[in-house]
Swiss-Prot record:
Required for the insertion and/or proper folding and/or complex formation of integral membrane proteins into the membrane. Involved in integration of membrane proteins that insert both dependently and independently of the Sec translocase complex, as well as at least some lipoproteins. Aids folding of multispanning membrane proteins. The keyword Transcription regulation does not apply. The chain crosses the membrane at residues 3-23, 359-379, 429-449, 467-487, 507-527. CDD domains: 5TM_YidC_Alb3, EcYidC-like_peri. Keywords: Cell inner membrane, Cell membrane, Chaperone, Membrane, Protein transport, Transmembrane, Transmembrane helix, Transport. It is a multi-pass membrane protein. Interacts with the Sec translocase complex via SecD. Specifically interacts with transmembrane segments of nascent integral membrane proteins during membrane integration. Belongs to the OXA1/ALB3/YidC family. Type 1 subfamily. GO terms for molecular function: membrane insertase activity. GO terms for cellular component: plasma membrane. GO terms for biological process: protein insertion into membrane; protein transport. Residues 44-64 are annotated as: Disordered. This is Membrane protein insertase YidC. It comes from Ralstonia nicotianae (strain ATCC BAA-1114 / GMI1000) (Ralstonia solanacearum).
Amino acid sequence: MDIKRTILWVIFSLSVVLLFDNWQRANGHQSMFFPTPQTVTTTAAAPGGTPAGDVPKAAAPAAAGSQAAPATGAVSQTPASEKIVVTTDVIRATVDTAGAIVTKLELLTQKDHDGNPMVLFDRSLERTYLARSGLIGGDFPNHTTVFTASAGPRDLGTGGEVSLTLTADKGGAKLAKTYVFKRGSYVIDTRFDVTNDGAAPINPTLYMELARDGGAVEQSRFYSTFTGPAVYTDTDHYHKITFADIDKSKAHVPAPTDSGWVAMVQHYFASAWIPAASAKREFYVDRIDTNFYRVGMQQALGTVAPGASVSATARLFAGPQEERMLEGITPGLELVKDYGWLTIIAKPLFWLLEKIHKLLGNWGWSIVALTVLVKLVFFPLSATSYRSMAKMKDLQPRMTAIRERHKGDPQKMNQEMMTLYRTEKVNPLGGCLPIVIQIPVFIALYWVLLSSVEMRGAPWLGWVHDLASPDPFYILPILMAVSMFVQTRLNPTPPDPVQAKMMMFMPIAFSVMFFFFPAGLVLYWVVNNCLSIAQQWSINRMLGTNKKAAAAK
């Protein structure tokens, strides 16, 4: 039965590793064990970082009197564009008058590994990630048209908001885009005003899309999560779309509806176009060029008579995946925070972690406190497991004697083993079931710590300055290895020397793997191991005291 317990531990360990590897591949990353050769691809981009001819086509043919959507983004005799920088207390946005799009968005409250503001939207040689919009259904202003910016303040200053309006006139349609930036908000309110200044009716369609390259944001396979488009509607709810599915033309796109939004998701951060409620919208997702993708929506604005105007509004979110903030923006947006398939357990754990943080004010100590609470909840199960293991350890000499006495008769050996278990009232698998029950909680807590942007840049104490990054001095992984080694010494020693060596090797293997895990996760494991050691030692001591008392009588 010791062999069965050892085998179960090995299966559990391998299951955790293989489950993680499968989850990595499901989120578009390479397998740790079966990596596929990466093909380096380049994007054939037009000047400015985006492919030519990427203006979306209208969902339906243009009405009579309207021109077809442009096949390319080429514009003759275009005036020179300029870049306008708008700054608030939380973001710094660079708006290019070419297309009236945000070509760079810096999150001032989030820092990258070099201590600079985290860049979300970007158009550079290294990457392209843009939120674009415009009109189709005719030769109308789109994201390749050069707009004219209005005069006005560019910094928030002491005010509550700052706005920027950009206008362009083309093909009989005048489009005015107005961006409103608000204090403390990662949401940019956007208004589209369309005026027909031609002599014939027009039928413009507004499009809003998020376009980016398919490159991974963070290369470490140990804490990278899903990168790619996502779509939400009240009917289909939330679903992610992998770049691989887009390449294979297998991407699922919801049917036209009057609810929902599109998003582009990456580790810790996301962006989303959120149209006004009840506005009819059609979704699309495709690959524009090699390694360049987009997800978007089209909203028909109806027939606009000469001299008439029509307006539409939307919100553009670009910021961190802070769950409570996302819940307050629009229904379902909090789902961009990826908890994996154990969301039903992970969400309550994060809620509890938040409550603890409000009391302690430090995410590291909050993880410690949460670990203690989880350990208290599982205390009865753990105690049962440790009692069973302690009894098995006491029976070890007698079990070894039975094996030696009946080494040539396995059936007789098993019969005597079962008799011994019944006599001593020991369940040989009693130490395993409580461990199995706790596995989903551990995995859920793993995803909580992995996906929570609150851990990013959050210090604990001393050398740990970022709970979302690996321990820079590997102190926590070493402590974890030591704690696992102590645990193996408290457990019954497997009778087979090979199994015993395997159990001694496991702490080393796990500690090496955890060198690359976020410090917050390793902190949880270390604290959990220390609590387990204390509990197991106290139970072993209590059973030893009871045994001495019984012998004295």
